[in-house]
Regions:
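Short, surface-exposed alpha-helix to beta-strand junction/turn motifs within ectodomains of secreted
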Residues: 52-80
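Bacterial N-terminal signal peptides that target proteins for export
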Residues: 3-15
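Bacterial N-terminal signal peptides
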Residues: 13-23
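Surface-exposed loops/turns
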Residues: 41, 47-48, 98-99
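A glycine-anchored, Pro-Gly-centered beta-turn/N-cap motif
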Residues: 93, 98-104
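Proline/serine/threonine-rich low-complexity linkers at boundaries of modular beta-sandwich domains
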Residues: 24-35
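Extended, polar beta-sheet/loop recognition surfaces of beta-rich domains
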Residues: 37, 45-47, 51-58, 113-127
């Protein structure tokens, strides 16, 4: 095989590799995945006031994101999202909670345009 033929073959393989990596990289990088939360999933907290903090692997659009509190009686309450300095974090505050099983339902919009959702169950207890 001539050196021009080898170069052409190498060039085609390199272009294909660059294309595949760029497509996969964009796809994998953009989805919002919850890295950590407070309260923690399955954890318990002491009432009545509970700070809420959700940290994601990518920045999220806070203006188009939602937080809801699922109450022990199955009622749902919208939670306000407080402005925060970190673009990968959503913050809110729960007040006046009584002992029982709750969950925070979240929905976020990632930079790639995909919506991610999840729930964080937790228990509120007295001291």
């Amino acid at each position: 095989m001539s050196s021009i033929g080898r170069f052409t073959r190498f060039f085609r393989i390199a272009l294909l590799l660059i294309f595949v990596l760029s497509v996969l990289g964009t796809h994998l990088e953009g989805h919002a995945i919850l890295k950590s939360s407070s309260p923690a999933s399955g954890g318990s907290v002491i009432r009545p006031d509970v700070p809420v903090k959700l940290i994601f692997n990518v920045r999220v659009d806070a203006a188009r994101s939602k937080l809801q509190l699922l109450m022990p009686d199955a009622a749902t309450v919208e939670l306000p999202i407080v402005k925060w300095s970190s673009p990968d974090t959503l913050v809110s505050k729960l007040t006046g909670l009584k002992p029982g099983a709750y969950a925070i339902r979240w929905q976020v919009l990632a930079p790639d345009g995909h919506i991610s959702r999840g729930e964080i169950p937790f228990t509120v207890r007295n001291r």
